[in-house]
């Protein structure tokens, strides 16, 4: 990944030299020399990345170069911080004057001298590497084709090809089973064959959903214990029990399933330790049609779980026709799966033949080509690269790994760093997308291009990996926005191997720059890794980290730490004391404390975190106060205080954080002692705003137009939980959201009729609308538009609105572009084309949803 490290560094250096020339004048010569050498070396670094896999000398040289660039980048940040480059103009001006102080001269000289030494060492590495690459000149540097080709996911991961027969067969087994017996089925086959996909198709089938009162999905990693598996089953049943012993857990499972027809899927079971199976198997109730599906790569596992041979399904490779169809669905996803260029069809079929019918391989190569230019010479180059990777393989598994290696090799440089962060997460872990994106921004992996903001560019990176089928979507919102994801275990194997060789991360936590915190964390891993750049909570759903306060003291030894995510953690001391220690980490750019306890307030010492760009304290229910020093974080891009129920208001001065792109959980003050809504109008870079409005006096009359000129704002969420008073309804009704708004969410709205501005005339660009909970009974007349004015809404969600009355036909007439409607717990919407709308509800879809 040295090409990724160099690319990120060059981008930062270029920006600093162009925009901050005065503050780096002491080091300008060294930076320019460094920039020149690295630009030249970019021309062969990608080839060096490939060749180092078989050349020990090259591997060592590339590793040395990577470490030198890391050090140069750290010096660069030190220079910026020392010169006051934190976005605060007054501080920057004063800091520049302080550079003239005699006490500063030795420090400046030391940094300048070290940059000079790094330059000399890099020049030497260049001379040693050059002989491996002939005819290389700086003009040979190619661009990363497809880097910005798609800014949102294009390929629909729910599309399934060639597995209809498999699904039909399994459903027949389930429906014909003897209810008096426990049915055990096994899906057996190599990784990447589609076992999990078949199980998901069956699990999510409507007929299966109606037949089984309880459906449970458990991802069984190689390191799972019987206790973890039992707790996972209980979480599927809505029970987040803690502290119980195994016997109690098993009895609870029995109680939940007794008298119910149930289906349990045990996905990806390995044969290393199956002692857990006997207890669970013996404890499962019989006599009401219970069924268990086990997916595994091992025939011995199928026998061990007592799956009869006639109930063991062995998926076959895809046929040539289905292989081509799946490839087209991915590679030509932007063209509805149609290949319209004969020259691409020929080379495409040649590539598909090399995939040998393996779905994971086909999707990986198809996703790669989706993101490349659709021209013959580029596809021919990829075909030859693929052939090189396949050479010498002796098994189907080798072929899958070769396709994944090809996909990694062909990634744009910055996406290589992004994908390697997934090496930190445990097997089968469901990963929050925002955690990934925030970490990428904090570490500087995200390239801001084509006028895209930092957060938008971070989303683009995620889409780039999703379109390449390297990340699998787990959960989406009604609007198609991805919430959580995961990676296939074979993709995980690849990124762990690369990350370990490049000292990015290491499962043993040694000699690396990134660590994942999960469960009871071994603090020694921090002690032996003082060069850490990222520490991320990788706890699985429903679990927490239990950390002690001594950990904070060890964090302070990692002075170059950029990302610290200790979300979903419980500490044995007040978190303010721990944050007091963390405040010394001046390179810190991303700090996540989401769902961390006990956090009551931030310490004043946090004012020293001048490099902070992302601060996430969402779901900290005990947080009562934000220190005024938060307004000093002039680089802040994201401030998330969602669901901080005890927080009274924000401090004055939030309006000075003009780089903010995302502000969530914002509670306008009820008095002049805190931040008023009027300050928000200064945040002209806002893309996403979440308001918490509970009292009418949070908004003054003269503040009602505070949102109208936020020209970049795309999403607004208004949460009125625990509100009272007609005055609040009047104030919300008089607000003026900006016309270009793309997505709107109303939660716990107290009014009986919709706000007057909720109309296609006032919000002509609105694409997604969500109204959840509250007292809404009807929509005001402007909501329905007229024959000349219609909504452009594509996605609508209505939830927990017990009194809302709305006609389905009238709704469709006013929303002609509607593609999907999600509705539940809305008993008065009887005319809707959604089954059980008054209870669990469902989704109506006109056509497959594509984000525009």
From Swiss-Prot:
Disruption phenotype: Increased sensitivity to the pathogenic biotrophic bacteria Xanthomonas campestris pv. campestris (Xcc). Reduced resistance to Pseudomonas syringae expressing HopZ1a.
Segments forming a coiled coil: 17-68
Entry keyword Membrane: yes
UniProt-reported outcome of changing residue 202 to M: Abolished HopZ1a-induced hypersensitive response (HR) and loss of resistance to Pseudomonas syringae pv. tomato DC3000
One family name in Pfam for this protein: Rx_N
Record note on what altering residue 136 to E does: Reduced oligomerization activity associated with a reduced ability to mediate cell death as well as an increased sensitivity to the pathogenic biotrophic bacteria Xanthomonas campestris pv. campestris (Xcc)
Cell location: Cell membrane; Nucleus
The keyword Cell cycle is annotated on this UniProt entry: no
Consequence of substituting residue 149 to A: Reduced oligomerization activity associated with a reduced ability to mediate cell death as well as an increased sensitivity to the pathogenic biotrophic bacteria Xanthomonas campestris pv. campestris (Xcc)
PANTHER family: DISEASE RESISTANCE PROTEIN RP, DISEASE RESISTANCE RPP13-LIKE PROTEIN 4
Record protein name field: Disease resistance RPP13-like protein 4
Organism: Arabidopsis thaliana
Lineage, opening ranks: Eukaryota, Viridiplantae, Streptophyta, Embryophyta, Tracheophyta
Record gene name: RPP13L4
